[in-house]
Amino acid sequence: MKKKLLAFALCTGAYAALFAYSVNSEQKTATSEMTDVSRLMPVKIKQTVKGQEEEMLIDTVKEANRKNIKISIAGAQHSMGGHTYYEDGIVLDMTGYNKILSLDQEKKTIRVQSGATWNDIQKYVNPYGLAVKVMQSQNIFTIGGSLSANAHGRDIRYGSLIDTVKSFRLLKADGMIITVTPKDDLFTAVIGGYGLFGVILDVTLELTDDELYVMKTEKMNYSTYSDYFSKHVKGNPDVRMHLARISTAKKGFLKDMYVTNYVLANHQDQLSSYSELKEDEYTGATKFALGLSRRYEWGRNWLWDTQQSYFLSQNGTEISRNNVMRSESKFLEYENNDNTDVLQEYFVPVKEYGSYIDDLRQTLSDEDLNLLNITIRYVQKNEKADLSYAKDDMFSLVLLINEGFSKEDQADTARIIRRMTDVAIKHGGSYYLPYMTYQTKAQMRQAYPKSEAFFQKKRTYDPDERFMNYFYQRYK
């Protein structure tokens, strides 16, 4: 029982990002229906092309130009909102384009094809004592997809993913391949650009040293969190990673919190004893517990109490950097004929957190939203990407929401999400773009003031809109 509770608590804390959906396809698959993990936007596509060789990708783009067919790009397909497919279009499935091309141990860089996952990189570099700088909490995402969303994670020292990219090669709409570096105009558009400028072929990323951390967890009230973070987390150079949770249970709703810091251990010479990479365990028990949380208020209360008790009991536990960045993921696979799980993510300036939570609580007090979980991370100010979400030092709040399939349920969830978005914008915040496109165009432009420049680049570099998805259709 103790092991099941342990696995359950670990798994339920991993909502940092984006859900999983895999396309079943051969090298080329004719017309079929495609959707994402939310199952809210099924459409008929013309063809899925599983890219394994560069020449095949080039030929596909040229053929699409000749026949005037739209192209969308899919990695592991974890985004929601139709970012990776388009009706009657070609989907390039990049998951087979996944080789590790080179590793420079001295410079701490790695070059990989875009269909490789973070798990592939971790397994390759772990024996050399190296680790990823910035990635999502889970390692199931492809590198190309992560660049396209400009991912972030638990690390609080290295910023967003864009800060760790040395260069990448891009297959453009005209069938030509170019190398893109930080000095190039396309660099800030492609990273965080959701596949709208071409096919990312391979990427050179900065790595860092694997390290041994000590887990330290404590409870607190939301009103003290901003000051606590500034003084004891950001202000302590030995804290390398950070994760927080705020209660969605009726008891302590949006008030009770606990935080987990990953602090540099004093005895780094013992890292090898902790460097074996962990894998998913006890998925069934975790899914069952989450099912209770979806259906019953007492289940949500129990979920919160169990998570909190477990992590508090782990004070002093030692863990490698690579293993911190391997949160469980299989439990996220959820199928039900009546409802589905969706994510929303809001970014709020650190100094605004307390008043933002008060306003969010007030907003939700008269709403019937099945809000299952909120995890919180830190993202330092970074406005390099054209669609940058971190206009200030921000807290990122990832909300897991269960919603029904009916048109009425979807419309109601969309309405509430727009209300929550207004709250974030009111406090100088923004929201993350890979999820359902429920926000209005006006909200998108408020949250992303450089969006018009981004769309102008799209019109300049891809005037025929060869690369297309529903995100672009919605907000262009």
From Swiss-Prot:
PROSITE patterns: FAD_PCMH. GO terms for molecular function: FAD binding; oxidoreductase activity; oxidoreductase activity, acting on the CH-OH group of donors, oxygen as acceptor. Pfam families: FAD_binding_4. It is an enzyme of class 1 (oxidoreductase). Its EC number is 1.-.-.-. Residues 41-210 form the FAD-binding PCMH-type domain. InterPro entries: FAD-bd_PCMH (IPR016166), FAD-bd_PCMH-like_sf (IPR036318), FAD-bd_PCMH_sub2 (IPR016169), FAD-linked_Oxase-like_C (IPR016164), FAD_lactone_oxidase-like (IPR010031), Oxid_FAD_bind_N (IPR006094). Its cofactor is FAD. Belongs to the oxygen-dependent FAD-linked oxidoreductase family. This is Uncharacterized FAD-linked oxidoreductase YitY. It comes from Bacillus subtilis (strain 168).
